[in-house]
Amino acid sequence: RPFWMWGAEMGVNEHGVVIGNEAVFTKLKVAKNKVLTGMDLLRLALERSNSAATAKQLIIDLLQEFGQGGVGGYQDKNFKYHNSFLIADKTEAWVLETAGIYWATKKVDDFYAISNALTIGEDFDDIHPEAIAFANKKGWVKGAFSFSKAFSDYLYTTFSGSKARQCRASELLKSNYFKIDVTSSMAHLRNHHDADFTPSKSLIGNSICAHAANAISRHASQTTSAMIVHLTADKPTVWVTATSAPCLSVFKPMWFTGMVIPDL
């Protein structure tokens, strides 16, 4: 939870429902006032749901009733965006991606990575009932309908470095598919795209573990926290850095026990 807002960018509740949120950039105008931020939607879903399926539906319902947008930057009050969500519990996981009031969902079969881009194409499992007709009316559909191709804003999505991060995360998950555990997940979250990486070398934020640099394009590209949730039949174990730069941070375990963990 960023200190300056009510909502949260990632979290887990006592039922083992886990949600992560990412900003995405679309062709639709982003409302600034009297709407819910993506972080509001995430927190409300965690407060009110007991499964990934109910969390997914709750976000969709809130999206239709209140819309989304708001101020997305602490200092830059003009920074606005739409949202994507990765939602999981101990039995299933879903990707929910949005553009204004429109949305598409996809059930995760094995592994999935989201970044600052729409990723659901033709293979959605469910979609807003008017999304395809709306995109066709706007002239955004070329050939078979793809949610990401129809609704993505090319410029902001490209310069966010989202494709490189999403591809790198997917590559790491695929190469370690049969041995994904807490330890390997920590390594993934500490990953830089090159072995000789230094923050000043990259013009865009293309590392999973991002470091702010270059005042023009990457002054705000800093990983400020990281979280891993180990879901089991019992209560989840939550590993958090609670500090920026995962490559320099220690992951601390937390549990839902009803008692306050003493300072480490």
Each language-model region and where it sits:
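A contiguous strand-loop segment
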Residues: R1-G38, L58-T183, T237-W239
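Intrinsically disordered or highly flexible coil/loop and linker segments, enriched in small
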Residues: S51, Q68-G72, T198
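Generic alpha-helical secondary-structure signal
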Residues: Q57-L58, H188
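Second-shell loop/turn segments in exported
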Residues: A31, L41-S49
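Short, charged, surface-exposed loops that flank catalytic or proteolytic processing sites
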Residues: R48-K56
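Accessory "access/gating" subregions that flank catalytic or transport cores
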Residues: R165-T224
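Substrate-recognition/cap regions that form aromatic- and gly/pro-loop-enriched pockets
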Residues: N206-L264
